Amino acid sequence: MNFETVIGLEVHVELNTNSKIFSPTSAHFGNEQNTNTNVIDWSFPGVLPVLNKGVVDAGIKAALALNMDIHQHMHFDRKNYFYPDNPKAYQISQFDEPIGYNGWIEVQLEDGTTKKIGIERAHLEEDAGKNTHGTDGFSYVDLNRQGVPLIEIVSEADMRSPEEAYAYLTALKEVIQYTGISDVKMEEGSMRVDANISLRPYGQEEFGTKTELKNLNSFSNVRKGLEYEVQRQAKILRSGGVIRQETRRYDEASKSTILMRVKEGAADYRYFPEPDLPLFEISDEWIEEMRTELPEFPKDRRARYVAELGLSDYDANQLTATKVTSDFFEAAVALGGDAKQVSNWLQGEVAQFLNAEGKTLEEIQLTPENLVEMIAIIEDGTISSKIAKKVFVHLAKNGGGAREYVEKAGLVQISDPEVLIPIIHQVFADNEAAVADFKSGKRNADKAFTGFLMKATKGQANPQVALKLLAQELAKLKED
């Protein structure tokens, strides 16, 4: 029997506000343990939460970007549970009236087709702290993350393969990143994914028993974990077994999912309205103000790059994969840079440099201005493409102007015949054996002189001019 895969995803996104959702403490990632805390985060008696308006701004933007309806009568709820990283013994979240609901996002699949994935809801809430278990036998609680604002985005169970889940996450990350409300860095925990997966016979309307997957620390692992679960569950069902409702984690080492716990029923969190936060209204004017702050989204940019700039679909997809790269490209083209040349550099030498250095585009000294200037001096013959690679590395590490560096470093391309011809003659004089081979008619003997000439000029000879002059002087040499 063949089975249909049914997948839904729950994605927690950390919002990049300066302060936490209900306290004025810094929400910055990476500080020393328990330094980003105050009496509200520690839940001291008598302290009251104060809602950060910037969090609601971000929630509205996310809802608009994901084509969602917005609940304009806003309130928060208490989700009750006890855990050491949750001092209040409850989490302030949203239950029956999330900020956004009934949305969708269009994703592009590997075969080039598109699919619309429904989004059930998006709700605002506070993050919990972090437990760490030491080798000394003690466990420690770091409350820096306690109260950091989150938006949880819950998809409909519309995905029918791990590939579709991967495409959904890619599209969701792009949209959230472009809104500017989060950096969505999974390695820093600002985007976290839980997956729910079940199988059912084709044609059956009712969902099968679902398994929840955790410990999915990359999009690749989401896909691998889901692929493993499809095989595991299908094997159980084909053998006549029954799928238990479980929470499992993906283990990278064994490339399998491992049981964490069996779920016997839905947890009872005893939700009730948060009494310490007043109800408030999200006005039409507020929504429209947030709408005006939304950028052009990746799908629209891709279409424009193809239609107006003549780029291929592949190039457009690569350039818009991150907002940083796309904004850099936009700025370079606005400065007069040739779109195809800028695209080639960003996808070629720039991408290779970033991978080798383990950095992002905003962490190096390359700017749209100096990249465009460098491309211009390649096109006007000041430097060769080979020398340009050296110039680029300097700009990436040190910044500054491309032309200024080329002139100071003596990297200007040699194109003057009156300079090149004497160098060619010196090459002949320094390589008598090669000259003898050439004169005797040895096959491909002339090609050696190209390397000799480029070495003599330290790669600065204009290739087109140099090859023409070399051919001219070799012809004379043969006649002698």
UniProtKB/Swiss-Prot annotation:
<keyword id="KW-0648">Protein biosynthesis</keyword>
<comment type="subunit">
    <text>Heterotrimer of A, B and C subunits.</text>
</comment>
<keyword id="KW-0436">Ligase</keyword>
<dbReference type="InterPro" id="IPR017959">
    <property type="entry name" value="Asn/Gln-tRNA_amidoTrfase_suB/E"/>
</dbReference>
<dbReference type="InterPro" id="IPR004413">
    <property type="entry name" value="GatB"/>
</dbReference>
<protein>
    <recommendedName>
        <fullName>Aspartyl/glutamyl-tRNA(Asn/Gln) amidotransferase subunit B</fullName>
        <ecNumber>6.3.5.-</ecNumber>
    </recommendedName>
</protein>
<dbReference type="InterPro" id="IPR018027">
    <property type="entry name" value="Asn/Gln_amidotransferase"/>
</dbReference>
<dbReference type="InterPro" id="IPR003789">
    <property type="entry name" value="Asn/Gln_tRNA_amidoTrase-B-like"/>
</dbReference>
<dbReference type="InterPro" id="IPR017958">
    <property type="entry name" value="Gln-tRNA_amidoTrfase_suB_CS"/>
</dbReference>
<dbReference type="GO" id="GO:0050566">
    <property type="term" value="F:asparaginyl-tRNA synthase (glutamine-hydrolyzing) activity"/>
</dbReference>
<comment type="function">
    <text>Allows the formation of correctly charged Asn-tRNA(Asn) or Gln-tRNA(Gln) through the transamidation of misacylated Asp-tRNA(Asn) or Glu-tRNA(Gln) in organisms which lack either or both of asparaginyl-tRNA or glutaminyl-tRNA synthetases. The reaction takes place in the presence of glutamine and ATP through an activated phospho-Asp-tRNA(Asn) or phospho-Glu-tRNA(Gln).</text>
</comment>
<dbReference type="GO" id="GO:0050567">
    <property type="term" value="F:glutaminyl-tRNA synthase (glutamine-hydrolyzing) activity"/>
</dbReference>
<dbReference type="Pfam" id="PF02637">
    <property type="entry name" value="GatB_Yqey"/>
</dbReference>
<dbReference type="GO" id="GO:0006412">
    <property type="term" value="P:translation"/>
</dbReference>
<dbReference type="GO" id="GO:0005524">
    <property type="term" value="F:ATP binding"/>
</dbReference>
<dbReference type="GO" id="GO:0070681">
    <property type="term" value="P:glutaminyl-tRNAGln biosynthesis via transamidation"/>
</dbReference>
<dbReference type="InterPro" id="IPR006075">
    <property type="entry name" value="Asn/Gln-tRNA_Trfase_suB/E_cat"/>
</dbReference>
<dbReference type="Pfam" id="PF02934">
    <property type="entry name" value="GatB_N"/>
</dbReference>
<dbReference type="InterPro" id="IPR014746">
    <property type="entry name" value="Gln_synth/guanido_kin_cat_dom"/>
</dbReference>
<keyword id="KW-0067">ATP-binding</keyword>
<keyword id="KW-0547">Nucleotide-binding</keyword>
<dbReference type="InterPro" id="IPR023168">
    <property type="entry name" value="GatB_Yqey_C_2"/>
</dbReference>
<comment type="similarity">
    <text>Belongs to the GatB/GatE family. GatB subfamily.</text>
</comment>
<dbReference type="InterPro" id="IPR042114">
    <property type="entry name" value="GatB_C_1"/>
</dbReference>
